[in-house]
Amino acid sequence: MVHMHITAWALGLILFFVAYSLYSAGRKGKGVHMGLRLMYIIIIVTGFMLYMGIMKTATSNMHMWYGLKMVAGILVIGGMEMVLVKMSKNKATGAVWGLFIVALVAVFYLGLKLPIGWQVF
């Protein structure tokens, strides 16, 4: 399940940047944007399944950290969607980019720090 979740995230980020480049070039990126929304669903479902699986075995304060990672992941998805919607409407995206980047850094940090992820830290 972890590999499916990581693959969904990787495809989601690729589709996000493809849709962003299409919108910023003035072309229609609606099809790619819809594909990205499908990836959002897959990311949320696989993430929730991972969360429920870890709740059976997590000890001490791991519940809290995985809950925070899930909230940060939902903020990343929200940030991605808000950036693309504002881009499609030709509105300013500065603050939304800030939300997206901060949440993405938090998700990657927690993903690398927590026991299920890679043991970099």
From Swiss-Prot:
The chain crosses the membrane at residues 6-26, 38-58, 65-85, 92-112. Keywords: Cell membrane, Membrane, Transmembrane, Transmembrane helix. The keyword Transmembrane applies. One of its GO terms (cellular component) is plasma membrane. InterPro entries: UPF0344 (IPR010899). Pfam families: DUF1516. It is found in: Cell membrane. The keyword ATP-binding does not apply. It is a multi-pass membrane protein. Belongs to the UPF0344 family. This is UPF0344 protein BCA_1194. It comes from Bacillus cereus (strain 03BB102).
